[in-house]
Amino acid sequence: GKDETRHFGEQAKKYEEEKILAIRKAEDPYVRWARNVVESYVMNKTVPALPSKLPESMLKNRAGVFVSIKKDGQLRGCIGTFQPTTDNIALEIRNNAISASTRDPRFSPIINIELPKLIYSVDILGEVTPATYEELDPQKYGVIVKHHEKRGLLLPRLDGVDTVSEQIEIAARKAGIYDDEDIELFKFEVVRHY
């Protein structure tokens, strides 16, 4: 009856909360920093200062960074830079975490009530190099499709993107590049942090 359904619903909710708690405990410093930035920005509209205990790799190195946010297994925001725009990876994460949570044009800005349900990943991009169709592999490489000033990027290892043609087609569509236009292809590897 109704009580059983409610009981099942409560169990499912508890299971989800425990799952997210386990993910939070296992977060590496890159992801924890991205989450802390989003929570601070969404709750208080403040941009947090860099914490003193970040790994040296985040403070000394520069790279393009993508911050992806999911809710209930679905993308909720994803913004990034394919080349560094700041002095270090920590600042790059901070800027892109704020943008992913509040400025992704595909989604409304994230609100307080969603914060406990969000799961984050941070991609640190390697060197971007010219590529041929044959060199691409959607499991290993991200792709940038370029036509004059238009440019579309797709990260590697995305659910539902299994072939090079799918990867190129989606990246081209994101950039507003049409099938009959000449394109240049570029590839890059990422280190994905959870």
Where are these regions (language model features)?
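Basic nucleic-acid-binding interfaces
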Residues: 3-194
